[in-house]
A protein has these predicted regions:
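An intracellular "coupling" helix at the cytosolic face of ABC transporter transmembrane type-1 domains
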Residues: 139, 197-205, 214-218, 224-271, ...
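A hydrophobic transmembrane-helix motif
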Residues: 36, 47-49, 149-192, 245-292, ...
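Extended non-transmembrane interhelical loops and adjacent amphipathic helices
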Residues: 2-16, 97-141, 208-213, 217-246, ...
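Helix-to-loop junction immediately C-terminal to a conserved catalytic motif
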Residues: 400
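ABC-family ATPase nucleotide-binding domain "signature/switch" substructure
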Residues: 483-571
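Membrane-integrated ABC transporters
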Residues: 1-45, 55, 59-74, 88-92, ...
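Conserved "ABC signature" C-loop
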Residues: 423-485
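Cytosolic ends of transmembrane helices, especially the final helix of ABC transmembrane type-1 domains
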Residues: 205-209, 224-228, 234, 272, ...
């Protein structure tokens, strides 16, 4: 079992940071309040149990005054206990939400920095990081606090009821200790190991199925044009088959666990009566003592047999912690790629300088580029051409800092941006799409647009936007409300022109274009390159069209086996 449960160090590395963060005082305050509420609730339970036993004894003895007095206490405790239970659940849920918020912000910060999200996808070591951040963090915070409350309350119950049970029957208490130890060992070693593994696999299969459905939603037009509904149905149904198969395996184990838990719990219903009946018949105990002992026995068993009774929740929590620990461990590995032996050295500078650059495929089996050296000053545009698969896009990714399998050095321009063949349009307002990635929230946009480089925040800036949209031949978007999302899907050609509008709104010194005009006719392509030239933007382009040579001064031709040729284009 020790090989499957998360290591103690890894467990604490996930659970403890929040309680040591800047928000620790608020967190510890809520936790302290939770402990106080649980302590009070346990005390009320003890009094409730004693008064209940007193009522039963009074009924058996037909003592009316004693009965009504015990009933009054019983009812008062019952009324007081209800709000304590509700407030306790509320505080626990609130603390869980705060903890989840902090953890989510922490993981998103790691995931969306140092291009970790890209490296994770490139390496493929971690499945469904989005599901781990969304669902596993929720499971961690919710289940761990729930189990903490149960464990703490069980500890208080053990203190409160074990003494009561010992005072009534010592043999019953000894039996309870032995029974709980044996039951916990069976549950821990027989059910814990497979359930953690199966729960983790279920999380993965559910996330894969959800991702498959999201992929269909994101590619609806292409699938419809291909008439690929049957293929997509088959693939999605096959993926659901993995969900079904693993869940069937899971519920079989849960059936075994439930059978064990029910037998374990139901056996205890008759034990107190069997062990205490002789004392009752001998006149050493009242009937109320039997009632108290039975209730104390059940509550003490719940405290001692926590592993048995909460094993399903423990295994779900263990699976979530394991997946988050794997994700946490993957972040520093990806961040340290740049310092690995033979990695590419990246630094920023005023212009593009490449020295002795060699690129290989991620597995190191194929040489893409060998000993490339060149320099490109502002205004000296570069076109990269060559057959498919020789490493053109890999070279641009290396310049952008995304490709690390190789060696050499790259000095990249500080003021540069990248346009892929299919531009990314975030699901946001038209304003945010145009400013992406320089502003994400209305406050950031307003603050940024209030400076010297401001656009879009006043009537003049809106007029400037309309002018730029006309320059890239998108007049249909000129009157689109800036704070509303795009309601109609754009063609690839329109998306490419919109990406150029972004560049013209915030002109960089260099722009890296990875077949960024592939969906455009020659007239639109020529117009966009002319707009770049007028704005003093130096393009570094990948393309196959001979017409692109008209818009560039330098030509880098890549060929097989890592060979290349660098020349000037004569116009």
């Amino acid at each position: 079992m020790s090989s499957t449960l998360p290591a103690t160090k890894s467990l604490f590395s996930i659970l403890l940071p929040y309680w040591r963060s800047k928000e620790k005082w608020g967190a510890w305050s809520l936790l302290g309040l939770l402990v106080v509420l649980l302590l009070i609730r346990t005390g009320l339970q003890v009094v409730f149990l004693i008064s209940g036993g007193e009522r039963t004894s009074a009924l058996a003895a037909q003592e009316s005054d004693r009965f009504y007095q015990a009933t009054l206490i019983f009812a008062a405790i019952l009324i007081i206990s209800v709000p304590f239970a509700s407030v306790t659940d509320y505080i626990r849920a609130k603390l869980s939400l705060y903890w989840r918020t902090w953890l989510t912000h922490n993981y998103l910060g790691q995931y969306l920095s140092n291009q970790a999200f890209y490296q994770l996808r490139l390496k493929g070591d971690i499945d469904n990081p989005d599901q781990r951040i969304e669902e596993d963090i929720r499971t961690l915070t919710k289940e761990s606090l729930q189990l903490f409350v149960i464990a703490l309350e069980s500890s208080f119950q053990l203190i409160g009821f074990a003494g009561l049970l010992w005072s009534i029957s010592q043999p019953l208490m000894v039996f309870l200790l032995v029974y709980s130890v044996v039951g916990s060992a069976i549950a821990f070693f027989c059910f814990g190991r497979p359930l953690i593994r199966i729960n983790a696999e279920q999380l993965k299969q559910e996330a894969d199925f959800r991702y498959d459905l999201a992929r269909i939603r994101e590619n609806t037009e292409a699938i419809a044009l291909y008439r690929g509904e049957s293929q997509e149905l088959s693939q999605s149904w096959q993926q659901f088959g993995h969900v079904f198969k693993n869940y069937t395996h899971l519920i079989r184990w849960q059936l075994g666990l439930n059978l064990f838990q029910n037998h374990y719990r139901y056996v205890t219903y008759i034990i107190p009566g069997i062990l205490l009946a002789p004392q009752l018949f001998a006149g050493n105990l009242e009937i109320g003592d039997i009632t108290q002992a039975g209730a104390a026995f059940t509550l003490t068993l719940s405290a001692l047999a926590l592993i048995v009774l909460q094993l399903q929740q423990l295994t779900s929590l263990g699976a979530a912690i394991r997946r988050l620990q794997q994700l946490t461990a993957a972040f520093p590995k990806n961040a340290e790629l740049s310092s690995a032996p033979h990695a590419i050295t990246l630094r920023s500078g005023p212009s593009l300088v490449i020295k002795n650059l060699s690129l290989t495929t991620p597995d190191g089996q194929k040489q893409l580029i060998k000993d490339l050296s060149l320099s490109l000053s502002a205004g000296e545009s570069l076109l990269i051409m060559g057959p498919s698969g020789v490493g053109k896009s890999s070279l641009l990714r290396a310049i952008a800092g995304l490709w690390q399998t190789g060696q050499g050095s790259i000095t990249y321009p500080q003021q540069s941006t990248y346009i892929p063949q299919k531009p990314y349009l975030p699901p946001s307002s038209f304003r945010s799409i145009l400013l992406y990635p320089h502003a994400n929230t209305p406050a950031e946009i307003s603050s940024e647009l209030a400076g010297t480089s401001s656009v879009l925040s006043t009537t003049i800036k809106t007029a400037q936007l309309q002018k730029i949209l006309e320059q890239v031949n998108l007049p249909s978007l000129c009157n689109h409300p800036l704070d509303s999302p795009l309601t109609q899907p754009l063609s690839l050609g329109e998306q490419q022109r919109l990406a150029f509008a972004r560049i013209l709104l915030r002109p960089p010194q260099y722009v890296i274009l990875d077949e960024a005009t592939s969906a455009l006719d020659l007239t639109n392509e020529t117009n966009l390159y002319q707009q770049l030239k007028r704005s003093n933007i130096t393009p570094i382009s990948i393309g196959h069209r001979p017409s692109l040579k008209t818009h560039h001064q330098q030509l880098l031709t890549l060929t097989a086996n890592g060979n290349w040729k660098y020349s000037r284009i004569l116009h």
